[in-house]
Amino acid sequence: TYTLGRGTDGRIGLAYKNNDGTQPGDYGDVWFMESVNNGTTFGVPVKIYDADFGPSGDSLGCIRGISMTYKGNAPAVAFETVKQTQEGSFFPGLPARIRFWSNTLPGADPNRSVVVADTSNVGYHPYIGVNDVLSSLGRPNIGVSSNGNALFIAFMVPSDEVGGAADTTTFSDIWLAGSIDGGFTWPQLGKLNPATPIKDWRYVSVSKWNDN
């Protein structure tokens, strides 16, 4: 899984989930690399998230959800981290997180990213039903305001409603998080869709740029 973005000066960023087949030692990790010559060549990949599968680790790693844009010439990456094993299993009913990374955040990689959303601010809603490779939080999509002052991340959160006779599955809600300090904090957070009528809100997308 990968995502592309373009900076103000034309630089191209590529953020991607680790290829667990060819690099099993970096299972569930997230990488970023950048090109300043229109994609002809890219710099050395930088690990921006290091999944911890050790005895005391949380075993949260990226599965599919990753999105990026640029805030000026600063990359801005949103990604999901889901409870999983290095043998290929994941747990849609367990707590997950939405994270944000930029090279303008304090600290050093791969420990620079911050948590945007988890069970502490959106509640715990396990995903049940058909295997859509979804979890209790997932599929983030990121955008930036036209003046470059604000970042927005929209993502999916399972609701407390289920439906379907043959394969009962959780309905999903769409949540939106906002930041005005370059992604260091995300104090603006709320559900976008109405409570009624009950519908399955999925796969949200945020415009990378917005002139209004």
Task: Enumerate the language-model features and the residues they cover.
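Extracellular, repeat-based ectodomains that mediate carbohydrate processing or recognition
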Residues: T1-N212
